[in-house]
């Protein structure tokens, strides 16, 4: 279809150019008299055969003026006067003198609209029929427009003349039919229809019924060339500065302002009172002035030193929105926004992914282009970029939507697919898990240097110690996958004197262990998320959120594995329900029990009979002890904040300090140090 239309346009251009250069001659009947249209065509052929006096100019223009001058045809004269004098109509009498019949103001522009459309006004048909001179030519009227508005001398005004051919409208033809059939003869309805058809055939232009697109294209091109400056927007602009519009503006200016717009009236009067600012500018004649800036050469020397801090602009890093509290998500959040638009004949899709990784309060994003309907068409993994808070994420989606609409310049459809909470692991009751490797992103910072590296996978120990109730951690039950969802944070610039190295590990997923060996009937699906953050004081803050309903929560750090058995108290584990009373902490009970747990390197678990509860753990790094009294510096401290621990912990019991010495507990200083540490790291309860 597109190719056929282009061919039709080319054909139309060829036909117009051929008719302009070599118009074909027509054959007429010798008996009949030529109509005004035939006379115009013969004049057109005659002018085309003549050579133009000036090159690149055409002679086959202004044919109606030339025809009137050759045959002295009678015309309807329309005078356009300047100012508020309006316009008038004149008819020529038998003696050759023109008499003015109608004079109207420019506000009554109905007749002018008919003249602009080159149509015969029906209201003038009766007046023109009573004229002394026959003014009709094949049903048409030749009108001469005399424009006096451009004349500067009003005493002897001159005018610009232009001729137009006014064709009868259907309303004028109906009036002619009624005037003809209003005599004494009896006209039937069939006779009236036959008369109307003959009038239409006599006044209508030649009709081409060729079913070719080139005919329509040719007609449209000719009409466009004729009506270039006569479009509706151009008419609207012309009317804005017409005399009638200017008169209306002057009348409105003299009216008093209504009471509601007194301020506008005051501002207009104040604006009129202010005179234009006078500038005393004297322009010298050419050649009398000398441009001094052209005479004096300009030498610029490069400065030896540049104050960079004076001109440099410091861009602050992205900070989370303070209006929204920092939320540590317990699960991954992923939202996909697919933008679909049709550019040309191709469907383009772009996917914007906004996601929040496990244990990271910041939002990240990535953009990828989908080549087909399936989202798997994009094989390349797009790079992710930092967005910030949730408000920033919404702003990014809105800005990207506006960007796609502005570039596509067409309607854009947006599809939102919310991934919601993505469960990290699903275990059916009684199902054993296969051991998996744990990969971590470790950032080591030395004083003055920061090195990022990825260590080899760390295997979870299959078994650590034994208990009276049996080996509760079998290789099939130990499972966990730790990974870094976000890039590690940059190393700090300053460190305490006693701190030589700090390790921070981002743990993304930690699976729950199903106690199949203990009570297979009570196991269910478990989900746990862990986040480890670096503390400036050399402590690692671990945020654990998980469902600990009668099962074991596995936590991993630089210490030996910590675990707990739900049913028995043995050297292999610690039952927190027996350690923590309802009234508060029992610091004296920690060291003796923790000694056996540290020596055996056994896991330690947490029991909770309630539903999902968050858990915060603060873990200290190794530091060199200065003396034996400072037992905390030689040990690794872990503070667990159990928020809303349900059955076995009251709201006033805020924290429990578990001290696992790297060389074992045996001195009395360990007990006192553990009591002081547990009191020092107490945190308020989170509701």
From Swiss-Prot:
For this entry, list what GO says about its biological process: gastrulation; regulation of transcription by RNA polymerase II
| Pro residues bias spans | 485-495
Q: What is the protein name stated in its UniProt record?
A: Transcription factor SPT20 homolog
The scientific name of the source species is Gallus gallus
Q: Per UniProt, which keywords does this protein have?
A: Developmental protein, Gastrulation
> Which InterPro entries does UniProt cross-reference here?
Spt20, Spt20-like_SEP
Question: Where in the chain are disulfide-linked cysteines found?
Answer: none
In which family does this protein belong, per the annotation?
Answer: Belongs to the SPT20 family.
An annotated Gene Ontology molecular function: transcription coregulator activity
Q: Where is composition skewed (Low complexity) in this entry? A: 460-479, 667-680
Positions of region (Disordered) = 423-502, 666-687
